[in-house]
Amino acid sequence: MNIYKRLKQDIDVVATSIINKLKSTSDSKKFDSLNDTIPIVLESSKDVNSYDISTNIAMLIAKKMNQNSITLANLFKKKLSHYPYIANITIAGPGFINFVILQEAWTNYLAIILDGSYRKEYSSIGNNKKVNIEYVSANPTGPLHIGHARAAVYGDVLATLLQCTGYQVTREYYVNDTGVQIDNLSKSVYLRYKQAITGQAADIPKGLYPGEYLISVGTNLAEEYGDKLLTLSEPEYLNIIKDVAVNNLLQSIKADLALIGVRHDVFFSEKKLHDSNVISKVIDLLSVKKLVYTGKLSQPKGQSSDNWQPRSQLLFKSTIFGDDQDRPLQKEDGSWSYFASDIAYADNKIKRGFDYVIFILGADHIGYVSRIKAIIQALDSNQDVTLDIKICQLVKLIEDGVAVKMSKRSGSFTTIRDVYETVGKDVIRFFMLTRKNNAVLDFDLVKLQEQSRDNPVFYVQYAYVRAGSILRKAKDNANIAYEIFSTNKSDFSLLSTKEELNLIKILAVWSHMLDGAVKNFEPHRIAIYLQKLAAEFHALWNLKSRDLDYRFIVLNDNNLTAARLALATAVREIIREGLKIIGITCVEVM
């Protein structure tokens, strides 16, 4: 069993007995309903020379039950000190409990890694619960820029992480294929079509899409229709162009996502919601719940009175669910608003029976968080669905030390394809996970082409390659040691140097780290972990240049060599597993 999982279970048993004893001796009735399952958090030590694992459980119980945290910490120490895998327990600060784990417990964990059974520690976390993850969902009005890649990679890796931990996952893309922006797209394409027919450069008015990426769409229309569209009225030619334009750009988006290994199971059309009359039915349902009314909105903050004309309109009572204002359901022309479409789309997700619904939004959509929460609360009366909304912050593309400004509307942006052709899929995917999703990320094209520690994916892949080279050399030059290793007879207790044990401790935290990553929807933890593992392995490798005793292959000591071959194999196994989840290639030679 994983050391962290075992320690957590043992702490839980002791915590439950302590809480129950405190309840039985307390006169206060407020403790009667206290939940026994206070969360147990285990943290790996940042100072491996003093202790291995720490917990603040005593402080949490003390706060909830008005007790002295140091006294409770010492009680934990007394009850846990006799466990055979625990070498020592110390109390620090206001009540942190620090554990030193027996060396044998760490080294024995290598066997669990080598036989692959470590995956069982997290493969059933999800218990087959159904999850819908919606990510990217960029309007099909142009190619995806590098900023879109962040939500794309985050969503794709989160989906893989959930799948490998026992969830049933649907990867979804919501296609906004109707509305004003699609009208503007179609008008822009029409001008490019005229350009192809007449040979005269198109004059693109402000508010439309001037990007040259639409020239090919216009040319294709000219080849298919000739000059026929020039004879039609605007409503007639726009009706033809809309579907062609959306389909062309959606196919382009899918192709760009495929370049960086991102996929979706479902592309859900907003237009179909409008065409099927579903929106009206959902609004009627909310009306029955008395959540819809006709009223007037207050003047938006910052808008001039000269430009504001209050009007009676159909509104959704989103403020009762914590939103900052009620939301309009219809536009001035009587058609349904984007918000009304969002309600119908959310209702569709709920009816598909998902246990979790995850929305991944860009930083420019932070304002949607409160309204999405209001929608789900209004529709999901039984609270059958758990909602989570994740925000992916901006990506600042850096070229030659200067930030590149991007705007799809102006036609000035760096596409995913541009960056892919410069650095490749693996660099894009890994680097998008080097910071938490809600932190701004600087994407430096120059540094990410270097074969150095500044290029994190190279650094991790190189650790995998180095470990593989050790095994190949041993197979050729240390036959006896390789035979001991390959027949699973390695003596792990021989791995006793401080550096070897530090590396093993990092390997042992993999399952614990992954448990936290999936439960918090934070796949960036995997990338951070892999960098730490690679750094520790490279550090151990480099020691041989100063001290030959640190060589992985010690020709006069077959048993030690066999043990170190097992260690190198364990490093490769965990790196392989981590890169597989992130969707990055494991290379054998660099």
From Swiss-Prot:
Protein name per UniProt: Arginine--tRNA ligase
UniProt cross-references to SMART domains, sorted A to Z: Arg_tRNA_synt_N (SM01016), DALR_1 (SM00836)
Subunit note: Monomer.
Sorted UniProt keywords: Aminoacyl-tRNA synthetase, ATP-binding, Cytoplasm, Ligase, Nucleotide-binding, Protein biosynthesis
Organism the protein comes from: Orientia tsutsugamushi (strain Ikeda)
InterPro entries: aa-tRNA-synth_I_CS (IPR001412), Arg-tRNA-ligase (IPR001278), Arg-tRNA-synth_N (IPR005148), Arg-tRNA-synth_N_sf (IPR036695), ArgRS_core (IPR035684), DALR_anticod-bd (IPR008909), Rossmann-like_a/b/a_fold (IPR014729), tRNAsynth_Ia_anticodon-bd (IPR009080)
Pfam families: Arg_tRNA_synt_N, DALR_1, tRNA-synt_1d
Signal peptide: none
'HIGH' region (motif): residue ranges: 138-148
PROSITE patterns tied to this protein: AA_TRNA_LIGASE_I
Recorded family membership: Belongs to the class-I aminoacyl-tRNA synthetase family.
Upper classification of the organism: Bacteria, Pseudomonadati, Pseudomonadota, Alphaproteobacteria, Rickettsiales
Keyword Transcription regulation annotated: no
Reactions the enzyme catalyzes: tRNA(Arg) + L-arginine + ATP = L-arginyl-tRNA(Arg) + AMP + diphosphate
A cellular component term, taken from the record's GO annotations: cytoplasm
Enzyme Commission no: 6.1.1.19
NCBIfam families: argS
Annotated coiled-coil segments of the chain: none
Compartments where found: Cytoplasm
Gene expressing this chain: argS
Gene Ontology MF annotations: arginine-tRNA ligase activity; ATP binding
A GO biological process held by the record: arginyl-tRNA aminoacylation
Enzyme class name: ligase
Principal subcellular localisation of the protein: cytoplasm
